[in-house]
């Protein structure tokens, strides 16, 4: 239970009951028969048909039973715990509760549990924002949070198997951050790696508004701008809805405060980069740049990167991806301009927070650097 809260930010209420039912069935009705079947096969080479039928029947019942309870999302208790020590405290509390009743210290378990589950304050001050660049493999998903609002820029991919980045990555992190609704979701364009998991996201959280360039939602086009808690949001491209333009129809969003700015570029290619240089020369300047098109050779022209003049460039790409993003050519562009470059495939989730200190405009945290594991060495 503590491990489920740590990893997934929620706990299925039915989980203890399911374990009480499944473990005895597997222990007494399935595993002994399976071992007997293996022994018969090993010594005689013959497996009675009734044993195979029995094991198949039990397996089918087992998976149907688990699948039924897996669909009961509405009975999931969402209460994420924060960090390793909260996990340790919750595990300690669970162990104390299991002690014999005669042990006088059992009442301390509930106090320890309250401390472990006490929510941390994630509220930002006015005029500041936090950007979470999620590790969604070869795709993009960025959460922008202000004091009272949340925007999700792209949602990652969905695969034919049903596996999707909304359920695997985005929703668990939103629960961990105690985010119960999204004010706006922007689907930069309709490629699967940017918009594929939207249906799964919409089933898992309340979404107040969707902006896109595919004509199916409110239009994410030049001229749309708004302000949340002292943070300004400006759409810099496209000028109209051109779904057939694919990558070049990407919604380009600039997020800015008085001290820090972030430019989110989707999958724009060279043609749009040059147009932005010509028509938004001052607007595209930003402290932090989300590298266009995951670091493909189609984008990140030296002229565009020079015009943006970022102090740091963040790339969202999958480890060992088939496109070899970011390419050596793109990495050379940023290196030649002395712009530090970090990538989700190496850093995992990347968190950018505008700083409260006057001398520092922002701070960047890389999940894997802060949470090293021996198997990543």
Sequence positions of predicted segments:
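Active-site-proximal loop/helix segments of hydrolase catalytic cores
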Residues: 166, 192, 196-201, 238-326
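Binuclear metal-ion centers of metallo-dependent hydrolases, dominated by the metallo-beta-lactamase
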Residues: 214-234, 241-247, 319-377
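Active-site HxH/HxHxD metal-binding segment of metal-dependent hydrolases
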Residues: 186, 190-223, 310
